[in-house]
Amino acid sequence: MKTKLIVVLGPTAVGKTALGIKLAQQFHGEIISGDSQQVYRKLDIGTAKATAAEQAAVPHHLIDVREVDENYSAFDFVQEATKEIANICARGYLPIIVGGTGLYLQSLLEGYHLGGQVDHEAVLAYRRELETLSDTELSQLVETKQIVMTEPNRRRLMRSLELHKFSQGVQNQGSPYDVLLIGLNDNRQDLYERINARVDKMMAAGLLDEAKWLYDNYPHAQATRGIGYKELFPYFAGDIGLEEAVEKIKQNTRRFAKRQLTWFKNRMAVSFYSVSDSDYKGKINQAVVDFLRN
């Protein structure tokens, strides 16, 4: 019998965290973060982590598991999430993954890896081929393959392309999970207003100080590439004003939300629920009940 697993996904700021907590409380679950930035300690505001009170109400996993100057990849996520799922189930709880990092979620659910079944010489040859491309050419290649990334750098672009190319033929013998995918969405205007309001709320909560600490101590760390931090660095350097930097955060977040939706719709068989529907929570609740009953 396959392990039952619920995944709550969707664009940033749509309300995934609140729904995940509600489902965990109602269905005896624990939450695993499926967000590539929430793994970093001390970066709480810009990564929109669940609050201390929320984490106290429901156990959360894969949050605060890396120092800011450490790297984290889809491979790390698959390995660690797999262990957390097994541990949660062993304790008699329902694992619920909540997040919007499409590459991480797809890698876990479809069993992607670059392990022993892969021809490593072929991987190295492809890597050498990628190394001949400019950053612009790598970005264009990633875009054509509809790989969603936040603030990509050259190393992450190449790594994602390797995963995309070589994972196609090395899926496990079917996913080990019986998965219910729950997608949240909203009409574009309302979603963009949510995003803008959330950025304003983050600024009021102290995002500027959090970003300044990162700028002063770890200006070149992988963590700095998350939306909400990098946009403020030119302000700290005296190159742009604060208002312009904040607007850039909003703009980049809106663009990222659009890319997230494209990824989920094209690559994952997910049922979407509009948060503008007054009964969307009731519909999701019934879907979970039916899923757990079967």
From Swiss-Prot:
<comment type="function">
    <text>Catalyzes the transfer of a dimethylallyl group onto the adenine at position 37 in tRNAs that read codons beginning with uridine, leading to the formation of N6-(dimethylallyl)adenosine (i(6)A).</text>
</comment>
<dbReference type="GO" id="GO:0005524">
    <property type="term" value="F:ATP binding"/>
</dbReference>
<feature type="region of interest" description="Interaction with substrate tRNA">
    <location>
        <begin position="35"/>
        <end position="38"/>
    </location>
</feature>
<keyword id="KW-0067">ATP-binding</keyword>
<feature type="binding site">
    <location>
        <begin position="10"/>
        <end position="17"/>
    </location>
    <ligand>
        <name>ATP</name>
    </ligand>
</feature>
<comment type="subunit">
    <text>Monomer.</text>
</comment>
<dbReference type="InterPro" id="IPR018022">
    <property type="entry name" value="IPT"/>
</dbReference>
<dbReference type="Pfam" id="PF01715">
    <property type="entry name" value="IPPT"/>
</dbReference>
<feature type="site" description="Interaction with substrate tRNA">
    <location>
        <position position="127"/>
    </location>
</feature>
<feature type="binding site">
    <location>
        <begin position="12"/>
        <end position="17"/>
    </location>
    <ligand>
        <name>substrate</name>
    </ligand>
</feature>
<keyword id="KW-0460">Magnesium</keyword>
<dbReference type="InterPro" id="IPR039657">
    <property type="entry name" value="Dimethylallyltransferase"/>
</dbReference>
<dbReference type="GO" id="GO:0052381">
    <property type="term" value="F:tRNA dimethylallyltransferase activity"/>
</dbReference>
<keyword id="KW-0819">tRNA processing</keyword>
<keyword id="KW-0808">Transferase</keyword>
<keyword id="KW-0547">Nucleotide-binding</keyword>
<protein>
    <recommendedName>
        <fullName>tRNA dimethylallyltransferase</fullName>
        <ecNumber>2.5.1.75</ecNumber>
    </recommendedName>
</protein>
<comment type="similarity">
    <text>Belongs to the IPP transferase family.</text>
</comment>
<dbReference type="InterPro" id="IPR027417">
    <property type="entry name" value="P-loop_NTPase"/>
</dbReference>
<feature type="site" description="Interaction with substrate tRNA">
    <location>
        <position position="101"/>
    </location>
</feature>
<dbReference type="GO" id="GO:0006400">
    <property type="term" value="P:tRNA modification"/>
</dbReference>
